[in-house]
Amino acid sequence: MVSKISKRMQQISQGIDRSALYGLSDAVVMLKERATARFDETVEIAMNLGIDPRHANQMVRGVVTMPNGTGVNVRVAVFATSSKADEAREAGADIVGGEDLFEIVKGGQIDFDRCIATPDMMPLVGRLGRILGPRGIMPNLRVGTVTTDVATAVRESKSGAVDFRSEKAGIIHAGIGKVSFENKKIEENVLAFVSAVVKAKPSVAKGDYVKRVTLSSTMGCGIKVDLSSFSV
């Protein structure tokens, strides 16, 4: 099995110079040419940042709405009551509730990809931190998932909102579309994501902020993108 995977990766990586940097348009073409899996692979981006992840004040976190969506049907849960619950439902939320939703999640039933909460619900939702936190879906004010404007938050989530957060090695990973997208739409999503990460640069970060940008598909190899393709 391992040999089959290795052989496949060798075939996919043919024609790619691992030490070279490619323009964004060329990188997208190469990525799509090598996406040969029998499903619509996700276009993934990895950004190596010049931050010290050991310091909390250099954490990079935010949210960006992909201009062309992500190609994923996102299920949204909203912790809200009364009129805010009605607004969430009307905006298209899949699950809406208060104490009842709390009990469902506490019991381990998490049938959603994104979680939104009104501020008054956070004392309750905060008790679910050990469940929602590790999954990266704990409502957070900084990424707009703790809000009184639940309708807008739901619509943005449904239309392609992507959360990002730097990891221990100072790297950010995210899925930003599907290989079935038109090349231009993938490029636009990449540019939007990179721009959002650049805007989220910590004021205390020193030196070069964006060190490397790499694109890949779910089953593909990494393709390094020339930073001159971006305003970094």
UniProtKB/Swiss-Prot annotation:
GO MF term set: rRNA binding; structural constituent of ribosome; tRNA binding
Q: Name one GO biological process term.
A: regulation of translation
The organism's superkingdom is given as: Bacteria
Which UniProt keywords are given for this protein, alphabetically ordered?
Repressor, Ribonucleoprotein, Ribosomal protein, RNA-binding, rRNA-binding, Translation regulation, tRNA-binding
| SS bond partners | none
The parts of the chain that form a coiled coil are none
Any one GO CC term of this protein is: cytosolic large ribosomal subunit
Q: Which PANTHER family match?
A: 54S RIBOSOMAL PROTEIN L1, MITOCHONDRIAL, LARGE RIBOSOMAL SUBUNIT PROTEIN UL1M
UniProt lists the family membership as follows: Belongs to the universal ribosomal protein uL1 family.
Q: How does it assemble?
A: Part of the 50S ribosomal subunit.
The entry's function note states: Binds directly to 23S rRNA. The L1 stalk is quite mobile in the ribosome, and is involved in E site tRNA release.
What name is this protein filed under?
Large ribosomal subunit protein uL1
Q: Which organism is it from?
A: Liberibacter asiaticus
Phylogenetic lineage: Bacteria, Pseudomonadati, Pseudomonadota, Alphaproteobacteria, Hyphomicrobiales
Gene from which this protein is expressed: rplA
